[in-house]
Amino acid sequence: MIVHPIDYRYGTPEMKRIWSEDSKIKRMVRVEMALLRALAKKGYLSEEEAKEAKKKAYSVTPERVKEIEAEIKHDIMALVKAITEATGCRWVHFGATSNDIIDTATALQLRDSLKILEVKIKRLAKVLADKALEYKDVVCLGRTHGQAALPTTYGFRFALWAAEVARHYIRLQQMKDRLLVGQMSGAVGTQAAFGKDGFEIEEEVMRLLNLKPALISSQIIPRDSYCEYLEFLANLAATLEKIALNFRLLQRAEVGELMEKFEAKQVGSSTMPHKRNPIDCENVCGLARVVRGFVEPQHQSAILWEERDLTNSSAERITLVESTVLADHILTKMIKVVSSVSLNLENIRRNLEMQRGLNLSEAVMIEMTKRGVGRQEAHEILRQAAMRAYENNSSLLDELLKDERVMKYFKEDELREILKPENYLGTARERVERVVRWVNEVLK
């Protein structure tokens, strides 16, 4: 019986395959076989025995493991018994503890997951950077506190998001060495069962798996690395939600500047035929909150008794799997949304013009200061003019033209030029181009 939405609604097939039960067991078998090969290299068993065991070990099924676990109440020992049953090899699991297998197999899953996330983060950063260049001269209304602010450009907005996503790409690279480690260190981390062979056996196992050995561990690898990973996913999810949220704000009927793609046969509402709801962005916002919610239980799972207890185990079966699958889901969704987004240039211009020049009050204030008026005095003159414009439902220009304190410094045509949004963009264009160059360099 399927009860979890990840099974039937959320997540990509490629990521769900990595975290499936069958995949987990196959990776744990792979770790056990790497241990046998390392033991063979040290002479505990013959190379031939290790090779023969490997041929048969992958016939172990989740169903058989569950049958044994139902009887003995221990999942890893059930796996060990199933492998021993399939291979006939008496050296299976020699010197190892359960989490030597679990944590090392998890590192393999995380490595494969990071490969997928890395490609998609790169893709999203590139799409955002391309949009930034495409829209670098599309002047729009900037908003702070939800209210009209200075003009900006859509290219600037997309460049801001592109830079943020590119920083996540950098963080992912930096995290790999700390996260992608395995262990073969025994019950309390001392490698006692291996004697003086411990370092060499562990290093050989990790070489075969293309992992690095943990510098030190108890019965388990310290969970600070898992905490860092979930914090990374939470941080990524926050960025994705921020982009999606702003897309939703800009799609509101009274704004109408931007629109996520709406398919020809797509239905927006079961009762309102006209609706074109931003469901992809809403989906991202909802699931991003779930991803961030896994950070706290993972932090709690890092706090264990002495050499370890089992309180982390049940939680991590959920936190690692669901956070990874859902983060990949919303990342995939945002690539789709950003790639196909469209701008309504008419509405963008309309929203600028609706401000009647009030959002350019700073531009006039700055120019007045340059022409000899004290900055604070100029601020008050412009504030008073703006308040009159609100009260009279007039334009800022109308009020300024009637104010002698202003007009002794300006001609009318000068004010008109100052109050053109495209004339007050500072280094917006250059900053967009700088960001795009940097993003492309990061993603090389």
UniProtKB/Swiss-Prot annotation:
<comment type="subunit">
    <text>Homotetramer. Residues from neighboring subunits contribute catalytic and substrate-binding residues to each active site.</text>
</comment>
<keyword id="KW-0456">Lyase</keyword>
<dbReference type="InterPro" id="IPR004769">
    <property type="entry name" value="Pur_lyase"/>
</dbReference>
<dbReference type="GO" id="GO:0070626">
    <property type="term" value="F:(S)-2-(5-amino-1-(5-phospho-D-ribosyl)imidazole-4-carboxamido) succinate lyase (fumarate-forming) activity"/>
</dbReference>
<dbReference type="InterPro" id="IPR022761">
    <property type="entry name" value="Fumarate_lyase_N"/>
</dbReference>
<feature type="binding site">
    <location>
        <position position="270"/>
    </location>
    <ligand>
        <name>N(6)-(1,2-dicarboxyethyl)-AMP</name>
    </ligand>
</feature>
<feature type="binding site">
    <location>
        <begin position="275"/>
        <end position="277"/>
    </location>
    <ligand>
        <name>N(6)-(1,2-dicarboxyethyl)-AMP</name>
    </ligand>
</feature>
<dbReference type="GO" id="GO:0005829">
    <property type="term" value="C:cytosol"/>
</dbReference>
<dbReference type="Pfam" id="PF00206">
    <property type="entry name" value="Lyase_1"/>
</dbReference>
<dbReference type="GO" id="GO:0006189">
    <property type="term" value="P:'de novo' IMP biosynthetic process"/>
</dbReference>
<dbReference type="InterPro" id="IPR008948">
    <property type="entry name" value="L-Aspartase-like"/>
</dbReference>
<comment type="pathway">
    <text>Purine metabolism; AMP biosynthesis via de novo pathway; AMP from IMP: step 2/2.</text>
</comment>
<dbReference type="InterPro" id="IPR024083">
    <property type="entry name" value="Fumarase/histidase_N"/>
</dbReference>
<feature type="binding site">
    <location>
        <begin position="314"/>
        <end position="318"/>
    </location>
    <ligand>
        <name>N(6)-(1,2-dicarboxyethyl)-AMP</name>
    </ligand>
</feature>
<comment type="pathway">
    <text>Purine metabolism; IMP biosynthesis via de novo pathway; 5-amino-1-(5-phospho-D-ribosyl)imidazole-4-carboxamide from 5-amino-1-(5-phospho-D-ribosyl)imidazole-4-carboxylate: step 2/2.</text>
</comment>
<protein>
    <recommendedName>
        <fullName>Adenylosuccinate lyase</fullName>
        <ecNumber>4.3.2.2</ecNumber>
    </recommendedName>
</protein>
<dbReference type="InterPro" id="IPR019468">
    <property type="entry name" value="AdenyloSucc_lyase_C"/>
</dbReference>
<dbReference type="InterPro" id="IPR020557">
    <property type="entry name" value="Fumarate_lyase_CS"/>
</dbReference>
<feature type="binding site">
    <location>
        <begin position="73"/>
        <end position="75"/>
    </location>
    <ligand>
        <name>N(6)-(1,2-dicarboxyethyl)-AMP</name>
    </ligand>
</feature>
<feature type="binding site">
    <location>
        <begin position="97"/>
        <end position="98"/>
    </location>
    <ligand>
        <name>N(6)-(1,2-dicarboxyethyl)-AMP</name>
    </ligand>
</feature>
<keyword id="KW-0658">Purine biosynthesis</keyword>
<feature type="active site" description="Proton donor/acceptor">
    <location>
        <position position="145"/>
    </location>
</feature>
<feature type="binding site">
    <location>
        <begin position="9"/>
        <end position="10"/>
    </location>
    <ligand>
        <name>N(6)-(1,2-dicarboxyethyl)-AMP</name>
    </ligand>
</feature>
<feature type="active site" description="Proton donor/acceptor">
    <location>
        <position position="269"/>
    </location>
</feature>
<feature type="binding site">
    <location>
        <position position="219"/>
    </location>
    <ligand>
        <name>N(6)-(1,2-dicarboxyethyl)-AMP</name>
    </ligand>
</feature>
<comment type="similarity">
    <text>Belongs to the lyase 1 family. Adenylosuccinate lyase subfamily.</text>
</comment>
<dbReference type="Pfam" id="PF10397">
    <property type="entry name" value="ADSL_C"/>
</dbReference>
<feature type="binding site">
    <location>
        <position position="283"/>
    </location>
    <ligand>
        <name>N(6)-(1,2-dicarboxyethyl)-AMP</name>
    </ligand>
</feature>
<dbReference type="InterPro" id="IPR000362">
    <property type="entry name" value="Fumarate_lyase_fam"/>
</dbReference>
<dbReference type="GO" id="GO:0044208">
    <property type="term" value="P:'de novo' AMP biosynthetic process"/>
</dbReference>
<comment type="function">
    <text>Catalyzes two reactions in de novo purine nucleotide biosynthesis. Catalyzes the breakdown of 5-aminoimidazole- (N-succinylocarboxamide) ribotide (SAICAR or 2-[5-amino-1-(5-phospho-beta-D-ribosyl)imidazole-4-carboxamido]succinate) to 5-aminoimidazole-4-carboxamide ribotide (AICAR or 5-amino-1-(5-phospho-beta-D-ribosyl)imidazole-4-carboxamide) and fumarate, and of adenylosuccinate (ADS or N(6)-(1,2-dicarboxyethyl)-AMP) to adenosine monophosphate (AMP) and fumarate.</text>
</comment>
<dbReference type="GO" id="GO:0004018">
    <property type="term" value="F:N6-(1,2-dicarboxyethyl)AMP AMP-lyase (fumarate-forming) activity"/>
</dbReference>
